[in-house]
Each structure stands twice: as structure tokens, then as C-alpha cells.
């Protein structure tokens, strides 16, 4: 299935699940959508936190198409699930933004680690959340983001359990793709990140971690949602964690070496 065909299946309501493993060779994107009055500070926030918030594209005020991401793409309808934040609280999840859209909204598309999972799989590195049919586990850490204006919050990480040799290979592979979070930020000790229990993720689903495996943590594009919560904007929107926008960008085009 091409990205365009996949987006049409989301738009029609035929697909409503997490997007891990979908359209493997193509980049997936996290979304943050907020009023233009705060867009400059949010852009500064992304630039200040590039590991967690690598920008793939930014829309014009009011535009629900971002051409660099896909010619027929509509960010109001092409994501399986959206989080709606009001005054910093998650108030609802919706499957379309058409009724909420405003002409001052600015779209920020942020790289997603689902993008490099295809490369890991091609190298024979098994991914537990895909094996178990679950959403990837994500955790809010104790590490503060670099603040920009009203935007701060804490770093969020995704976790994939890997054997030692696979973890080393994963570092080598993902280092080539800083536009989708790049290399892991930590391997092995959840408490060093302020994570008390791997079995209780803040977002997504818990997965099995075997005795011969290490938890491998990547910076995660859910990080901006902690910033949106802290900023307490009257209205801001993001993707539901794990339910991404699939773009026409190839993963290969994002490699830096």
C-alpha cells in the first residue's frame, strides 16, 4: 500500500489503529497544531530540543496541507486519532479535525522513530511491540526540555527491548537518521531517566522485556505534548501517541550518511 492509499484508508475510517509497521519505507510524523500567535515560540522550542523534536515540515497559518509531506495530504483527516488539549488538559480524542479547524492554526510535523523501524527489521532486529501487536511504550522522564517562551515540559522517550548485540547494531543504524530522533539517548537503566516501572508506560502499551534484553530508549515526538500541557493554551492539538501521519518522504531520503 502506498502512503497515499494508506491516508485514504484513514480518511475513510477504514483504518483507525496504531501505525507502527505501516508503509515501512516511508517516514511517519508526529503532529503539533497550535495557534499562529504561539508558533514562533514553538518553532524555537523545536530548534532548542532537536533530538526529541526534529522538524520534517511546518505549515503556513491556516493550511491543512504541508506539501513537503505529501501532495494529497490533509492533516485534518489523515491521522487515525488526534488528542485535543484545552487549557493544558487532554479533553478528547477525535478521528477528524474538520469541525475544530481554525484559520490561524499552524501545523508542525516532527520526525517519528517508527520511521527507522523498517531499517531495523531489515537487519533482522525484532521489535517487540510489533511482535505483540501493541503500541510502542512511551515514558515521561525526569529530564526537563530546554525552554522557549511558554513551552517547556519533560522529555518523553520510547522504549524497545533488545539483546546487547542488537542494541549496538540499532545505535549504528539509527545514528544515520537524526531527522527521526537518531541514536538512542540511553540504554539499560530506566531509573536514570526517572522511569520507575517499565510495565507502566505513560503512553502506549507495556511490552515484554526478557531477561537477556536491555531496554533501549529513544527521544520521542510525544515530547511536545508535555510542552503543550504545561503551556495551557486554550486549544492545541496533537496526534494520539502511536497514531501517526504517514508521509510521502522516504526514510532513505532522511539519512545523513
UniProtKB/Swiss-Prot annotation:
The keyword Lyase applies. Gene3D superfamilies: PSTPO5379-like, PSTPO5379-like domain. Signal peptide: none annotated. One of its GO terms (molecular function) is lyase activity. It comes from the Bacteria. Disulfide bonds: none annotated. InterPro entries: D-Glu_cyclase, Putative_hydro-lyase, UPF0317. Transmembrane segments: none annotated. It is an enzyme of class 4 (lyase). SUPFAM superfamilies: PSTPO5379-like. Keywords: Lyase. It holds the Pfam family D-Glu_cyclase. Its EC number is 4.2.1.-. Belongs to the D-glutamate cyclase family. This is Putative hydro-lyase Bcep1808_4029.
Amino acid at each position: 500500500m502506498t502512503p497515499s492509499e494508506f491516508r485514504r484508508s484513514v480518511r475513510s475510517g477504514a483504518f483507525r489503529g496504531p501505525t507502527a509497521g505501516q508503509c515501512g519505507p516511508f517516514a511517519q510524523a508526529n503532529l503539533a497544531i497550535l495557534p499562529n500567535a504561539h508558533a514562533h515560540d514553538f518553532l524555537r522550542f523545536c530548534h532548542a530540543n532537536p533530538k526529541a523534536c526534529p522538524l520534517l515540515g511546518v505549515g503556513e497559518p491556516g493550511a491543512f496541507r504541508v506539501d513537503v509531506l505529501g501532495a494529497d495530504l490533509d492533516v485534518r483527516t489523515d491521522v487515525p486519532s488526534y488528542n485535543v488539549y484545552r487549557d493544558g488538559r487532554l479533553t478528547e480524542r477525535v478521528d477528524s479535525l474538520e469541525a475544530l479547524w481554525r484559520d490561524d492554526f499552524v501545523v508542525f510535523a516532527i520526525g517519528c522513530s517508527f520511521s527507522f523501524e523498517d531499517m531495523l527489521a531489515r537487519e533482522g532486529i525484532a521489535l517487540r511491540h510489533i511482535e505483540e501487536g501493541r503500541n510502542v511504550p512511551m515514558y515521561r522522564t525526569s529530564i526537563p526540555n530546554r525552554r522557549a517562551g511558554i513551552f517547556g515540559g519533560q522529555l518523553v522517550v520510547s522504549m524497545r527491548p533488545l539483546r546487547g548485540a542488537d542494541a549496538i547494531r540499532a545505535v549504528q543504524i539509527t545514528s544515520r537518521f537524526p531527522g527521526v530522533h537518531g541514536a538512542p539517548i540511553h540504554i539499560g537503566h530506566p531509573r536514570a531517566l526517572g522511569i520507575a516501572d517499565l510495565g507502566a508506560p505513560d503512553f502506549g502499551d507495556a511490552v515484554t522485556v526478557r531477561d537477556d534484553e536491555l531496554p533501549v530508549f529513544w527521544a520521542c515526538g510525544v515530547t511536545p505534548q508535555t510542552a503543550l500541557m504545561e503551556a495551557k493554551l486554550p486549544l492545541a492539538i496533537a496526534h494520539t501517541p502511536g497514531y501517526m501521519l504517514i508521509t510521502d518522504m522516504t526514510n532513505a531520503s532522511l539519512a545523513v550518511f
